[in-house]
């Protein structure tokens, strides 16, 4: 799942995930309300979460998701790569933290592949959400 208010950045994330994981099912949401509805109906295994969402921010949304769905892996993506945000992400129980600039880095896709394998999916031909 991709939770990002910028439709253009959401498309970049989806494009790159589909390029690396062609059969991955990618759910998207533009804000916390939409994300929560889709989490309850679609049960994603992995969430890319923007911090700067309209309304409820991504850190608070992460805390709420982890309270209800502790097994969901949440990767925080932000333009604000500062120690304060990293510490807040840890406090709010995010699993990983990346700057948006690092998204196209192969390390992010290696991490996603490793998460999918741990979740029991074939990362090359996954039907993971």
Locations of regions flagged by a protein language model:
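The feature encodes the CheY-like receiver
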Residues: 54, 82
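Acidic, metal-coordinating helix/loop segments flanking the phosphotransfer/catalytic sites
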Residues: 28-46
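Acidic catalytic/metal-coordinating carboxylates
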Residues: 31, 57-60
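As written
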Residues: 58, 90-96
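Short amphipathic alpha-helix used as the core "switch/output" element in two-component signaling
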Residues: 37, 59-70
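Two-component/phosphorelay signaling modules centered on CheY-like receiver
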Residues: 7-27
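Conserved acidic carboxylate
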Residues: 4
